[in-house]
Amino acid sequence: MENSSLTLDDFLSRFQLLRPQVNGETLNRRQAAVLIPVVRRARPGLLLTQRSARLRKHAGQVAFPGGAVDSSDASLIAAALREAQEEVAIPPESVEVIGVLPPVDSVTGFQVTPVVGIIPPNLHYHASEDEVASVFEMPLSEALRLGRYHPLDIYRRGDSHRVWLSWYEHYFVWGMTAGIIRELALQIGVRP
């Protein structure tokens, strides 16, 4: 699929037609969820954050809004929506959830479920000073271009795993965030 002229309707159609298979197994891992906020426009955008440099883990990294599931969360989707509201002031009722991607295992011991949602273009994002340094939007067609991501094999504690690296403007997009974006691209039929 050529995605340089990807419209929101194209994205929605492809996502719905090629709905991912999610098995629901948690494998006794701690659960977390992230929101993949797609901005509703003729040429949609992908909303991302840069984490605060003051955070203990993943400081300064580009990420989707999200985090660990709390006991008060009714579901993984509820956790993603709560975290998006806490981190960037996206009201949960403004998100049209269209589905989830298969969970991803993090190096920090979480099983992370990406929740795909459409958000209005006129939201006023407000970054939580404690957690988020900045909020930015990347054109979805650019984010889903697989050629922009470069593999790096990392060896840790005797195990090897592949991470993906990319730049957008002055933001370094890598690791789990880049991997989730690539998975979304593959899910809607983008080919390398």
Curated annotation (Swiss-Prot):
<feature type="short sequence motif" description="Nudix box">
    <location>
        <begin position="67"/>
        <end position="89"/>
    </location>
</feature>
<keyword id="KW-0378">Hydrolase</keyword>
<dbReference type="InterPro" id="IPR023735">
    <property type="entry name" value="Nudix_NudL"/>
</dbReference>
<dbReference type="GO" id="GO:0009132">
    <property type="term" value="P:nucleoside diphosphate metabolic process"/>
</dbReference>
<keyword id="KW-0464">Manganese</keyword>
<keyword id="KW-0479">Metal-binding</keyword>
<feature type="binding site">
    <location>
        <position position="87"/>
    </location>
    <ligand>
        <name>Mg(2+)</name>
    </ligand>
</feature>
<dbReference type="GO" id="GO:0000287">
    <property type="term" value="F:magnesium ion binding"/>
</dbReference>
<dbReference type="InterPro" id="IPR000086">
    <property type="entry name" value="NUDIX_hydrolase_dom"/>
</dbReference>
<dbReference type="GO" id="GO:0010945">
    <property type="term" value="F:coenzyme A diphosphatase activity"/>
</dbReference>
<keyword id="KW-0460">Magnesium</keyword>
<dbReference type="InterPro" id="IPR015797">
    <property type="entry name" value="NUDIX_hydrolase-like_dom_sf"/>
</dbReference>
<dbReference type="Pfam" id="PF00293">
    <property type="entry name" value="NUDIX"/>
</dbReference>
<comment type="similarity">
    <text>Belongs to the Nudix hydrolase family. PCD1 subfamily.</text>
</comment>
<dbReference type="InterPro" id="IPR045121">
    <property type="entry name" value="CoAse"/>
</dbReference>
<dbReference type="GO" id="GO:0030145">
    <property type="term" value="F:manganese ion binding"/>
</dbReference>
<feature type="binding site">
    <location>
        <position position="83"/>
    </location>
    <ligand>
        <name>Mg(2+)</name>
    </ligand>
</feature>
<protein>
    <recommendedName>
        <fullName>Uncharacterized Nudix hydrolase NudL</fullName>
        <ecNumber>3.6.1.-</ecNumber>
    </recommendedName>
</protein>
<feature type="domain" description="Nudix hydrolase">
    <location>
        <begin position="29"/>
        <end position="160"/>
    </location>
</feature>
<comment type="function">
    <text>Probably mediates the hydrolysis of some nucleoside diphosphate derivatives.</text>
</comment>
<dbReference type="InterPro" id="IPR000059">
    <property type="entry name" value="NUDIX_hydrolase_NudL_CS"/>
</dbReference>
